[in-house]
Amino acid sequence: MRPLPHRYVVRLAAGPTGYADVLAGGRPTLRTAPPVEYDGPGDAWSPEHLLLAAVQGCFLFTLRAVARMSKVDFVSLEVETGGTVDRQNGVTRFAEIVVRPTLIVPAGTDRTRALGVLRKAEKACLVSASLATPIRLEPEIVEVDVPVLAGAIG
């Protein structure tokens, strides 16, 4: 990791109606629009979906680092993240975000350590830590037999 602080810049281009294009330094343009709940077309990324995707992405990348440092191997990760938008104290906001990771680990993995790695990743994720919204983790661990590669040394 490069030394802190890090700076990120995103640009938005839009007219008075329709889609908005989000640009960030040579990356593919991201087409955005309001979700159908706010009378949007429902065929583009919305700010609400982008926030949940940011929580998921940060969780994954933090998990990779935490698992590596903790020497906990995993085969794959699947995450479903949901958020509830509601009005609280006169402000429309995310009332809760629920992160449901399914961590696929090799058979025989210490489940307690694997759960600990998931919990630590959620707490250490900079996106989640930057939000005022409560984030609930509902983890699942699934063990699978992993074939040993020919010639691999244990």
Predicted regions and their residues:
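Extended beta-strand/beta-hairpin segments
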Residues: 1-53, 60, 64-154
